[in-house]
Each structure stands twice: as structure tokens, then as C-alpha cells.
């Protein structure tokens, strides 16, 4: 049974990666720009470089993670990102683009992710999830203004 579940997971991930890659190949230059922005944020977070919060997040940011009782703000993001950074390490991660829609100075980006991490007890875990991010372009640069999503429920 375990092998079957792992095979289904592997095929699902491969299909998601292929579908995302195919979609990204037809993206406009501006869509590719916001996808690079997303990738940069994930790289910085994995490297425990929390400067992304000050440079890539709008002061009026609101976000709602799965499992949280209510939306939170930039100060909460900074607080909990610091805690998570001190207590876990990303071993590997990958994000798969699904859609990117841009209207004027607003962009909506949707994607799926997979993360392998290790906590302070040296316990390893792999999770998958999804996000919808809302970006705003001010003074020529994109910033996160909202997002919703997070880890998929474990069965």
C-alpha cells in the first residue's frame, strides 16, 4: 500500500511540474517577471534571509494561512518567520506555477509547492500545498500585498 501511495504522489508531482512548466513557457515577459519574484522570495526564505519581508512585502500586507483562525499582518509575518527560521531548516523545495494574471499594477499568482524540512529535533517532513498571492506594483517594483493558502491536509 505504501509503495502505491508513493507512486501516486510521484506521478502527481510530475504531472504538476509538467503542467506548470508548460504554462510558464507561454507566459509574457511581465508574467515571467512576477514568477521570478516569487522564486526569489522562496529562495530567500529557505536560506533564512528574512530581509525579503522588509524589501518584498507591502506595509499593508494581509495574509491568511491554512489552519490560522484569522488573517495576519506584516508584523506577525516577521515574528513567526523569525521563529520558524530558528526552529527548522528547509532541505529542499520546489514551486510549480499554475497561473499568473496581471491587470494594471495588480498581479494574482497561483502555484503549488513541495517542501522537505527538518525541525530542531532533526525530524524530517515533506509537505505539499498551494498559494494564491496578490502582488502590487509601486514605484516600479512588485510587492506582496496579500496571500492565502498553505500546506495541504495530511491524510
Language-model features: where?
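A solvent-exposed, acidic/Ser-Thr-rich amphipathic alpha-helical stretch
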Residues: 32-35, 49-103, 112, 124-127
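Short, low-complexity N-terminal intrinsically disordered segments enriched in polar/charged residues
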Residues: 2, 19-60, 155
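Short beta-strand segments enriched in hydrophobic/aromatic residues
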Residues: 57, 113-115, 148-151
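A short acidic/glycine-rich loop-to-helix N-cap element
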Residues: 25, 120-126, 154-155
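A short, structured loop/turn motif at beta-sheet edges
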Residues: 100-107, 123, 135-141
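Bacterial N-terminal signal peptides
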Residues: 8-17
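Short beta-strand edge/turn micro-motifs at domain boundaries
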Residues: 128-153
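Beta-strand elements of well-folded, non-transmembrane domains
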Residues: 115-119, 135
